[in-house]
Amino acid sequence: MKGYVHQFESFGCADGPGSRFIVFLSGCGMRCKFCHNPDTWKMKDGKEYSAEDVLKEALTCRSYWGKKGGITVSGGEPLLQIDFLIELFSLAKEKGVNTCIDTAGGPFTMENPWFEKFKKLMEVTDILLMDIKHIDETEHIKLTGLSGKNIIQMFRYLDEIKKPIWIRHVLTPGITDNDEYLTKTRDFIRTLSNVKRVEILPYHGLGAIKYKDLGLDYVLKNTPSPSEERVKNAKEILECEKYTGWKD
């Protein structure tokens, strides 16, 4: 089976435990206002690779991974190519490779046949990096263009099967840095028993040039990065120091 790949990154240190080989898949249904990779939105803009070829490429970097590293598949939204993911990760596990998915959870549904595929994928997935775009449903739709209800459902399911997750939240002034919303996000995280790490990602506008190149309007072009004080405040509210997984 072939998948649509946007690009590879041979040495990533912020996308899962240890050093990682990152596979960025093409295709995403969300249109997050702070997205810095709009060039990944269209699936067929990516280059076709077989799962075998992707794994072969990744394994050339295996000597850098150490005991904790491995492969992270990001995007775009990797769950849009779930069949390809299953094949890639199944091959990776045959080689003893640690597997991680970086996802916003947008495609998740408990309806079959997709859900049966997802359960199969979880059998060969070690860790998930998951975004909480916005805890408020109305604001989530404004921010991403899609509902977040199924994403909450995905969090609940992953907790049920005890699959380790690493939660990330993009802190964007005027959109996701409201203390009330941060507190609600914290309260939701507290209901989950499988959270190993919580991380704040300060918003930046470094992707603005890509929007210009693609002829797209970048609606946050006048939005500044959050101050150190607001980042510290968010970390305290979300109790980031409480979650110590993969920090050593």
Question: Where in this protein do the model-derived segments appear?
Answer:
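N-terminal [4Fe-4S]-dependent radical SAM core
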Residues: M1-L25, G29-K47, T60-K67
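Auxiliary Fe-S-binding modules of radical SAM enzymes
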Residues: K2-C13, W166, L171-D248
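Generic domain-boundary/flexible-linker signal
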Residues: G16, F34, M43-G46, I82, ...
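Short glycine-enriched, charge-decorated loop/helix-capping segments at active-site entrances
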Residues: D39-M43, I141-S147, G215-T223
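Short, conserved loop/turn and helix-capping segments at secondary-structure boundaries
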Residues: E48, G145-G148, S225-E228
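Conserved AdoMet/S-adenosylmethionine-binding subsite of the radical SAM
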Residues: L59-S63, K67-G70, G75, L79-L201, ...
